Amino acid sequence: MKNILVGVTGGIAAYKSASIVSLLKKKGYNVKVVMTENATKIIGPLTLETLSRNRIYVDMWDTNPHYEVEHISLADWADIVLIAPATYDIIGKVANGIADDMLTTILSAVSVRKPVFFALAMNVNMYENPILKENITKLKSYGYKFIEAEEGLLACNYVAKGRMSEPENIVEEIERYNIYSKIKNSDTVLKGKKILITSGRTKENIDPIRYLSNNSSGKMGYSLAQAAVDLGAKVTLISGPTNLEAPRGLENFVSVESALEMYDKVDSFFKDTDIFIACAAVADYRPKEYKKEKIKKSDSDLLIELVRNPDILAEMGKKKDKQLLLGFAAETNNIKENALKKLEKKNLDIIVANNASTMGRDSNTIEIIKKDKTSIEINQKNKIELAYNILLEVISVLKKDKNEKE
């Protein structure tokens, strides 16, 4: 699905459409933009024309020479339609079959088999209006998809829900759908499975202002959690500190800080888990003693005695009964060799090997290795794509185990 039609309406968030179009182009999508007349008063068509590298469509009665019925040809051309911002007005029109300008006429002609996303944006009172809620419910029943608004400072100076989701989040939603749509009908193996995932980094406090930690962003674990939810799993995410929003649709979201806290939470959920994915970057060591007051600087060296933290994945490997265990090996050298050692030592079913230098980045190259020593290498994919590829390997292991038992 590489052709995206972006509809820009007259909400103040229309200025963000420039970033959305730019991000989509960087992802390799073909982008065409349709604007309402009101949208052109907020952001100039030339800006979006330059970013999309395509003509902008506004007027049904454009006098430029063309030989197509454009509202039909554009509806046919698009693989995905994204309305951003999606205002109270556009939702009401589409829900009630009104087609009185170029954008709404195109939307009336888009096949029901094509995904149409609305990125909601409006004043909080409009957002909570029962008429809007009824229209959204109606459109959802027809298969339309909605990207919820976020809380924040609105144009009307309210601080409330109604602000359009950030362009990065909107594009990520499109990316996730695009990948998910390729596999959603092929497998239902994960539907109803209880999946426990750890993500993020841990913090080991030295004193009130200092701690030991690492550079993990948590993006891989959060992407896995969202992908698993999308594939029908019941997901519990145990997360160390990150700057990320919790994925939607989780059964449980548990925040922790230290390795010991993470161990205790994993242990409490593990018994009833079908699949455990250990994606967190857990500190191997912690200070033996926590100083309640700030350690003062002195002229001499400072020695901090460290003690081992429990190896969460290894401990769960010992307790493993019916669970499938998947771990990660972030290495700086002998990557596959070290990953294979961890696979065997920790009693894992799958291990994902990668170079530790890529920690925190949006894309990565990984090698997925299974306990039968078969492996697959995936080069330079974003973490959403990697998440689905990892889960496809989990599905293949579950299928194989089921066939062997039968």
Stretches with model-predicted labels:
Residues 1-118, 123-406:
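A cross-family phosphate/adenosyl-ligand binding-site feature
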